[in-house]
Regions:
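Short, low-complexity, disordered segments immediately C-terminal to signal peptides
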Residues: 22-29
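Short acidic low-complexity segments
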Residues: 83-94
Length: 147
């Protein structure tokens, strides 16, 4: 519990900091290999559907080249929900999206999603080699109005 509290404080502080050049670069840095991380993509795509209308939202994702498996699964999951994905950041009306997935310790994974200038943090517990989502925290999350 102490670790989660410290992690939340750290995320609060970083969410107030100005954007850096890596803000929209996705990264995937975890040590545990026995876990199926696709749950993170599934959870995010289910969460975001309430705030950004499929078929009316085009995401620009600067994907992580080091973990193609997760990146491809994440992009395909969004496409299956009806979202368009663009590789051209000069197009109009893009919604910029990136993710940073990292391991806090042996029991916790954090997934941070940057959507335009908003941030969503999700902390997952590792229980019996599975990810369990006990909590979603969002800092400065201003969703686009659906419709």
């Amino acid at each position: 519990m102490k670790i989660l509290f410290l992690a939340l404080i750290a995320f609060f502080i970083t969410s107030c900091a100005k954007m850096n050049s890596d803000y929209f670069n996705s990264s995937f840095a975890v040590e545990e290999t026995k876990i199926n991380y696709n749950k993170i993509a599934d959870d995010f795509s289910q969460f975001i559907i309430s705030y950004y209308a499929p078929n009316k939202t085009t995401f620009f994702i600067n994907e992580d080249k080091n973990n193609r498996d997760f990146s491809n699964y994440f992009i395909n999951t969004l496409r299956k929900k009806g979202y368009a994905i663009s590789n051209d950041n000069s197009k109009k009306d893009l919604t910029f999206l990136s993710y940073q997935i990292s391991q806090i310790d042996n029991e916790n994974i954090v997934a941070i999603f940057n959507i335009n200038e908003s941030k969503i943090n999700v902390i997952y517990k590792i229980i019996e080699n599975k990810l369990v989502k006990p909590n979603i925290t969002s800092f400065n999350f201003t969703p686009k109005t659906k419709g």
